[in-house]
Swiss-Prot record:
Organism: Bacteroides fragilis (strain ATCC 25285 / DSM 2151 / CCUG 4856 / JCM 11019 / LMG 10263 / NCTC 9343 / Onslow / VPI 2553 / EN-2)
Domain of life: Bacteria
Matches recorded under InterPro entries: CinA, CinA-like_C, CinA_C, CinA_KH, Competence-induced_CinA, MoaB/Mog-like_dom_sf, MoaB/Mog_dom
Family, similarity comment: Belongs to the CinA family.
PANTHER family registered for this protein in UniProt: NICOTINAMIDE-NUCLEOTIDE AMIDOHYDROLASE PNCC (PTHR13939), NMN AMIDOHYDROLASE-LIKE PROTEIN YFAY (PTHR13939:SF0)
Protein name stated in the entry: CinA-like protein
SUPFAM superfamilies attached to this UniProt entry: CinA-like, Molybdenum cofactor biosynthesis proteins
SMART domains for this protein: MoCF_biosynth
Amino acid sequence: MFAEIITIGDELLIGQVTDTNSTWMGRELNKVGIEVIRVVSVRDRADEIIEAVDASMKRADIVLVTGGLGPTKDDITKQTLCKYFGTRLIFSEAVFENVKRVLAGKIPMNALNKSQAMVPEDCIVINNRVGSASVSWFEKDGKVLVSMPGVPQEMTTVMSEEVIPRLCAKFRTDAIVHRTFTVQNYPESVLAEKLESWEMALPACLKLAYLPKPGLIRLRLTGRGQNRSEVEACVNTESAKLEAILGEDILDEEDTPIEILIGELLKKKNLTLSTAESCTGGSIAARITSVAGSSEYFKGSIVAYANEVKTELLGVSMETLEKRGAVSEETVIEMVKGAMKALKTDCAVATSGIAGPSGGTEEKPVGTVWIAAAYKSEICTMKQETNRGREMNVERASNNALLLLRKLVK
């Protein structure tokens, strides 16, 4: 069963608003066996909306439209869909009651808000309990188009409570089963080469996808078929083969973020952690503290961007900085020791590098980052030398620091 998503709004195309709706819909539809094959964004222009709708209705079984249902003049989705389906707008007392309920005590009722009760005559109107814009369900030639509000909270509510259950009742869908493995220590091309024979022999019902992240690769194995038990058995069989090939290079089998894995490991071993960060600017600490309950094992961070902070708060010697430089193995070793001492922790990570876009030299180009991880008296280091732009360099360094710590503590 195939679906297409059409998001409507000039704000999406000029980058003023990020389309999170499509990501959420794709994930939730996939859970019930509906595969999204295309996502299209169009402006608030009637001819462009009609063109997109017509193309999607020809290709897909289900078309999901979001946006353009507000009360202002630039919200033209309802009128445009009426034109496409050859119907007209009529006033709905039931929808008007819902509009009054939603707006009560918040916004005065005026003609624009009352216009929210105008709905297409030839459609199933679905109530929106958290907003004033109703949902329109159209059927044509065995296919379904659903028009929903673009406000994420409203869309997710009506999709979860109304649209997805109705789609499941109307259409027979395949079972889709995913297993995602997070793999470390491999460039994508090297990993693909290692898995080539296994991948070539996969059954037709299975598909493998490579999803690179800075310092990591996620392998998503997807099985699809009418019998869920058979699909799950097939996925499990091939997953076992993959595990035998990659062994300890598999970091996780549930696509769990590394910061959560680190937290679980530290809690299990009753250890405490601190960070000393230069080029990563506190991003490692931010990731660690994004996990609920991290106060059980994380004590704090020293963001030592300037050399004087490295010396005064972390105890890095001026001699090391002058002879080896801030971006050096010796410096991060002293930083990680200083963090453990200052914050009295069992383990720590430290980073110092050149994130870019400027500041590099021939000896130490942009993207050079030294990373250290310490666990009690043990210290290990690594040098990162890949330049993928400032943001990516920082993210990669953060990942590598946490991976290095996990390897040391595990």
